[in-house]
Amino acid sequence: MNRLTGKNHYFLRQKIAPWLILALPIFFTLWLKYYPIFKAFYISFFDYDPIHQPGKFVGLQNYVNMFSTEYYWDAWKNSFVFLFLQIAMVFLIPVIQALFLNELRRKNLISTMYLLPTLIPTTINVIIWRWVWHPDYGIANLVVKFFGGQPQTWLSDPNLVKFCIIFPGIIGGGVAVLLYLSAIQGISPDIVESAALDGCTGWKRIWYITLPNIRFVIFIQFVIAVSTAMQMLDAPYMFASGGPSGASTTQGIYIYNSFQQDYNYGRGSAASVILMLVVFVMTMIQMHFENAEKE
């Protein structure tokens, strides 16, 4: 009897208890994460009417109409430009900063300086940088004029607005720098010393020892950078509302405008589904190459 009771207790503790603990988080994950995805997929086949739901069934017409507009493809082009800038300026540069920061003696003090800008709310950060880019009294044009250049209308120039939106990420990318720095400091000193004895120092040490040992952190940050860039909404919208002339309109802004300005829920849902599929495929490709390198 005691043995049977013990088995029941073991079964409850090892098999049932974990599921009971995870039941509520799983429920909210399904409700708040996966249900909206299936709901968006469902709505994308309707001329959705929020009052008389779900509205008229139109099949793939929302997708056809969306693919036939130049505005939609311009939003994709802008999203990929932002992706390139995000990788170049907010992904690669923090890696380089962390490598140099690791060579300094007072790295703890400087690490704190990197962390402080991340505490500034996005709204306040945008207000500060809009002032920096102001064509009349902004710091950016003061610097340009100091070096003999011509003042620029930064946020009103289609060729400059993307750079202006991404550039603050270099200053606010302190968390990424600290993650890379932590990964670098986590490399075993024995590995570094052995490499030094074999003549692997300087740039060779960075290329053959440091970067391979922080590859997983780089991969995670790369996935986050890709996902963030493809879904970018807040910064382009607060800086330029997708302008000028749609030059900073991303897929995020396109979807937002479809819902909030045009009240075209079917088109917005269709765009959301396509964006989700693109991000998913890109993430799977990245994971495939990461796994291939491990093998």
Q: What positions do the PLM features span?
A:
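Short, Lys/Arg-rich, polar N-terminal cytosolic tail immediately upstream
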Residues: 1-12
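A structural signal for multi-pass alpha-helical bundles of membrane permease subunits
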Residues: 10-295
